[in-house]
Amino acid sequence: MAKSMYAYVREAWKRPDRSEVKALLWERLQTWRREGSIVRVEHPTRIDRARSLGYKAKQGIVVVRVKIRRGGRRKPRYTRGRRSARMGMRRLTPAKSLQRMAEERASRKFPNMEALNSYWVGEDGRSKWFEVILVDGHHPSIKSDRNLAWLANPVHRGRAERGKTSAGMKGRGMRTRGRGTEKTRPSIRSHANRGK
């Protein structure tokens, strides 16, 4: 059976450092570094990934590229007296992934839209870039779409902030079930944060 165009795109993005994507990214990152932290884009950079996550080229759907810093928490040094070990500066791992943070920022920037999903598009030594698919649940073309009409329901408000996207579910430990996951449901906080 003949491969589709999406299959070739997916294959190229599987190992971007070993395919023709490497040269493309090298050029793109030079432009992206000079841009703002949240930029609306005309077309998804990875069309195969976007479509597999629910993207459709229609009104009411927008793709934004979000730049986010790499690394752990960057906390300011305390000026009050305490031992250096108790300053809470080093080895503080955030409970959220950078992808979740990117989704939340995009969602806050476009308050009338909900984050459907997101995917990685590039990184360098200092930053990571994610593209977030945003959907306006009250747009007529979305309301009449049987695959996306559920977003109009008020229970789906603030999806990104409540960890309901794919990246959010992963960060909350919802990808695994059964033995060893007793403290992840109904939520991490309900078990005094012992689930992670």
Swiss-Prot record:
Residues 158-196 are annotated as: Disordered. InterPro entries: Rbsml_eL15_core_dom_sf (IPR024794), Ribosomal_eL15 (IPR000439), Ribosomal_eL15_arc (IPR020926), Ribosomal_uL23/eL15/eS24_sf (IPR012678). Disulfide bonds: none annotated. Keywords: Ribonucleoprotein, Ribosomal protein. GO terms for molecular function: RNA binding; structural constituent of ribosome. Gene3D superfamilies: Ribosomal protein l15e. One of its GO terms (cellular component) is cytosolic large ribosomal subunit. One of its GO terms (biological process) is cytoplasmic translation. Residues 186-196 have a biased composition (Basic residues). Pfam families: Ribosomal_L15e. Belongs to the eukaryotic ribosomal protein eL15 family. This is Large ribosomal subunit protein eL15. The lineage of its organism: Archaea, Methanobacteriati, Methanobacteriota, Stenosarchaea group, Methanomicrobia.
